[in-house]
């Protein structure tokens, strides 16, 4: 929604933490400078940077509620939508979970193209590209675990439980705190 977009203006969020920290190594990302400039432009104008949604991104947004219901059924849990969560009262760092689960968990849903979903099913693990997002969401939301779900309505879903990686989160926290300083 527009209100949700306004809350995110100028704030690094977990979905873009890979632009600050590299997924596989946990080292600073080469795209951090460009990302900082985008966020500064948002902060100065009060407007989010325009991002062109691909058809698959749009499809993912449209299918998220269906995927969340599937997750609830498959995992026999109740989930709660949360909106934007800030790391602390400074409101400089955030995450937007697809859902919070129980007292200690969260959920990240992806609804990719069929060939990508098949790859995720075969690999049966958190794709490396999403490590910063998932570990970052646990850091920001103060959760102990996060489920990564890949959903395609014509195939079985993939749900992978990911636990906190404290050394990775410590590196991430240092880089992101320096990024917003």
Task: Label the model's feature ranges.
Residues 26-27, 66-70, 146-149:
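Intrinsically disordered, low-complexity boundary segments flanking structured domains
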Residues 37, 68, 134:
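Generic structural marker for isolated residues within well-ordered, non-membrane alpha-helices
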Residues 1-62:
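Charged, glycine-rich intrinsically disordered N-terminal tails and low-complexity linkers that flank
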